[in-house]
């Protein structure tokens, strides 16, 4: 509540004449300006201490004390100009000075919470975090980008062997221009992907078997055969139109009996071979005379050298052939005479008319066949048909599906 200290009766009269409203409007405008100034200069206001605000308040109180004396002097001087005194602007100074301390206090109260937040413990800044222990940076591992040819070769090798040894991996790496570690990591990832796909296939086929109608299960050795029927394969069949009865084929006439083959005459047995009588022993061949040694040939006489060939004498130079006379131009012959057209061809005379063929004997009618027995009526065919039942085979090793369902 505002105190009336330092105000005179004329000030109270001014308030009754709506002067106070103008002052309040001015104070409101001043409040808006100071609030904007306070927002703009937070750092400056925060640095100021409370004793400075106290000294400002005391100075303002001192000015308030000096204002009533001026008003009293003005009242003592005379009240012959009341309208001029109402319009004098200095009268608003006491009001403004009186209103300023509460505004400063209000501004101080508004600015104190940010000041406490600024003066309070702050989070660690850049230099402090730099001094503290920092976690080591994780280096991002570079992924190998395989080409289409490398992937195709790796997939083909994986189809043959899922666990290649060191020698096979080194050969494959040298052929594909890769390192052995990269090939080993690729096979590990490929085996994990293969196992994951097997689990997905197992769950998918298990769900399909659960949805099927209750059927028997055939167990045979290490393979479990489970019939699986997919309800989505049930289709609605169009009712078939009745077909005309099919006439039966007449039975074939019996064939004449085959003439039996005459029996072959028996083969006479071969006479036994007469035993060879033991003859006298072969006389040994006497050795012939020894061959006389061939005498050596006499040495060949050396062939005498041929006499040197006499050089062929060069003939006289050939005289140049003189050019002959130019060929005479063949004169053009007379134009060819046009062949006159020949006489027209005489038409061929018509031949004698063809004699009609005599009619042949009439064809004998075919004898009627035996009557056909009527076919039994067909059973009713339902309009809704089911797809054929599929048999899924899966090898089971130690209660684990080792291969996908086929």
UniProtKB/Swiss-Prot annotation:
Region (Disordered): 1-21, 33-142, 341-364
Its biological purpose: May coordinately regulate cell cycle progression and transcription during spermatogenesis. Inhibits degradation of polyubiquitinated cyclin A and cyclin B1 and thereby arrests the cell cycle at early M phase. ESXR1-N acts as a transcriptional repressor. Binds to the sequence 5'-TAATGTTATTA-3' which is present within the first intron of the KRAS gene and inhibits its expression. ESXR1-C has the ability to inhibit cyclin turnover.
Chief place of localization: cytoplasm
Pfam families in alphabetical order: Homeodomain
Extent of Low complexity compositional bias: 87-105, 113-123
GO cellular component: chromatin; cytoplasm; nuclear speck; nucleus
Gene giving rise to this polypeptide: ESX1
Species classification: Eukaryota, Metazoa, Chordata, Craniata, Vertebrata
Keywords, ordered alphabetically: Cytoplasm, DNA-binding, Homeobox, Nucleus, Repeat, Repressor, Transcription, Transcription regulation
Annotated protein name in UniProt: Homeobox protein ESX1
Motif Nuclear localization signal per UniProt: ranges: 138-143
Organism expressing this protein natively: Homo sapiens (Human)
């Amino acid at each position: 509540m505002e105190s009336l200290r330092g105000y005179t009766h004329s000030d109270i009269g001014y308030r009754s004449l709506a002067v106070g409203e103008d002052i309040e409007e001015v104070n409101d405008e001043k409040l808006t300006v100071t609030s904007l100034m306070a927002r703009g200069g937070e750092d400056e206001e925060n640095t100021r201490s409370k004793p400075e605000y106290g000294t400002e308040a005391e100075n303002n109180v001192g000015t308030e004390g000096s204002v009533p004396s001026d008003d009293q002097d003005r009242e003592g001087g005379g009240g012959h100009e009341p309208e001029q005194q109402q319009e004098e602007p200095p009268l608003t100074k006491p009001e403004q000075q009186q209103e300023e301390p509460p505004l400063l206090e209000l501004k101080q109260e508004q600015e104190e919470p940010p000041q406490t937040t600024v003066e309070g413990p702050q989070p660690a800044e850049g230099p402090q975090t730099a001094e503290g222990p920092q976690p080591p940076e994780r280096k991002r591992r570079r992924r190998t980008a395989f080409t289409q040819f490398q992937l195709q070769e790796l997939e083909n090798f994986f189809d043959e062997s899922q666990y290649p040894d060191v020698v096979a991996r080194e050969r494959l790496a040298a052929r594909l221009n890769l390192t052995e570690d990269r090939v080993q990591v690729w096979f590990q990832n490929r085996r994990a992907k293969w196992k994951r796909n097997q689990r997905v296939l197992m769950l998918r086929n298990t769900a399909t078997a659960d949805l099927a109608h209750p059927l028997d299960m055939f167990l045979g050795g290490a393979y479990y055969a489970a019939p699986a029927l997919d309800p989505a394969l049930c289709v609605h069949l169009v009712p078939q139109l009745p077909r005309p009865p099919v006439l039966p084929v007449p039975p074939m006439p019996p064939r004449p009996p085959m003439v039996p083959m005459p029996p072959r005459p028996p083969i006479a047995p071969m006479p036994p071979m007469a035993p060879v009588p033991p003859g006298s022993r072969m006389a040994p061949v006497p050795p012939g005379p020894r061959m006389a040694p061939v005498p050596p040939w006499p040495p060949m006489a050396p062939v005498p050298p041929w006499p040197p060939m006499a050089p062929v004498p060069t003939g006289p130079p050939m005289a140049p052939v003189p050019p002959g006379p130019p060929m005479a131009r063949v004169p053009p012959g007379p134009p060819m005479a046009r062949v006159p057209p020949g006489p027209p061809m005489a038409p061929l005379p018509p031949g004698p008319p063809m004699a009609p063929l005599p009619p042949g004997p009439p064809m004998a009618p075919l004898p009627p066949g035996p009557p056909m027995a009527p076919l039994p009526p067909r059973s009713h065919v339902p309009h809704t048909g089911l797809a054929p039942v599929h048999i899924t085979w899966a090898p089971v090793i130690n209660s684990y599906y080792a291969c996908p369902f086929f």
